[in-house]
Each structure stands twice: as structure tokens, then as C-alpha cells.
Amino acid sequence: MSAPRIGVLALQGDVREHVRALREAGADAGEVRRAGELAELDGLVLPGGESTTIGRLLRVFDLLEPLRAAVAGGLPVFGSCAGMILLAQDVIDGRPGQPLIGGLDVVVRRNAFGRQVESFETDLVVDGVDGPAVHAVFIRAPWVEKAGDGVEVLARVADRPVAVRQGPLLATSFHPELTGDIRVHRLFVEIVRSELGLKRGRS
């Protein structure tokens, strides 16, 4: 099977780190900045950064509606930190009118673990990730305040969900691209491959 084509939204955040991790995990990965590139992708990563800034840039580059349509159409998407916020249905402590892509049936709390001075690292057991605990880096991170029935919680910190999955959508509060451990990215690549197999089976 050929490598799945996975784009990393290159407006802000740890774009190169995500691209490198995806390539190591077996994907044909590259940067994405234009709506027209979405149709060429088998999957997409929304990296961390500042969620309100990214939301504004999505409007500036006319990406918001195409991304909403892509998610609604079943494109597998992995959002880390700010990416989790963008995939949420609603945000607590967000800016008024903050643009969201949606698709993931969760309500998240922005900066739930505190501002940058209160960022931290910890080891997590993540369902679907084999081997030892995942070393997770949290930077002004959100958590999931409320999850719908169709959302699978993959990991928690202090009983708060920090990694979730709903069908082809995956989201983490933490930054797996910063540690050199590619297992979360490998999980997403496996999700993309599975969706490709289902799509081929339907065609």
C-alpha cells in the first residue's frame, strides 16, 4: 500500500515537527496552506499555536469553510492543543466569535491547565498506543470539559480527558510532535489507512 498523503496546516505552530513525525510514521507528509490542496489529501494535522490567531488566519486565507466541509465529508484530522480547540463544537473561555472548524462532539476549556508559566510534562497511558507511557508536553493546554456519547477518551490527566477520538478525528491537549516519540502520529497514520481501506471498499 502506498504511503497516505497527510498535510499539516502551515499557518502557525510546530509544522516542521509534525511533518517529520508523520514521515517517520510512514506518511507522505507536507505543508498545506491553500483550500485547493485539501482535495489531494488523505488526512490533515492541525498543529498547536494560538487558537484565536489560527482562527483569524483561517478566515484570511479562506480556509474555514473548506475545512468544515472536508471534516463533514469524512477527512481524517488530528488536532493537537490549539488543533483540539479548532475541532471542538464549543469552547469555554474562548474569545467571542472565535472561529471553529468543529466536527468533534466535545466542549473544551481553553488554557485549562493555566498559562505558559504553568506548562508541564507528564507520562500518560494512551489507549491505542502500544509500549511504555507516552511522555506528554502540555503548553497552555485545553482539556475536554464534556464529551458526547460517540467520543472515545484515550487518555486523562487529573481525570480530565486530554486525548480523544471520534471516528476519523483524533485530538490531544498535548504536543506529541515535541518529544521525538512518533507513536501518536503512527496511530493517526493507522486511522488514515483504515479510512482509505473503507473508502476503497465502498467504491
Curated annotation (Swiss-Prot):
Give binding positions for L-glutamine: G49, E50, S51, R110, I139, R140
What's a Gene Ontology MF term here? glutaminase activity
Q: Name one Pfam family in it.
A: SNO
Identify the InterPro entries for this entry: Class_I_gatase-like, PdxT/SNO, PdxT/SNO_CS
The answer on whether this UniProt entry bears the keyword Lyase reads yes
Q: How does it assemble?
A: In the presence of PdxS, forms a dodecamer of heterodimers. Only shows activity in the heterodimer.
Functional description taken from the UniProt entry: Catalyzes the hydrolysis of glutamine to glutamate and ammonia as part of the biosynthesis of pyridoxal 5'-phosphate. The resulting ammonia molecule is channeled to the active site of PdxS.
Query: What protein name applies here?
Result: Pyridoxal 5'-phosphate synthase subunit PdxT
Origin species:
Parafrankia sp. (strain EAN1pec)
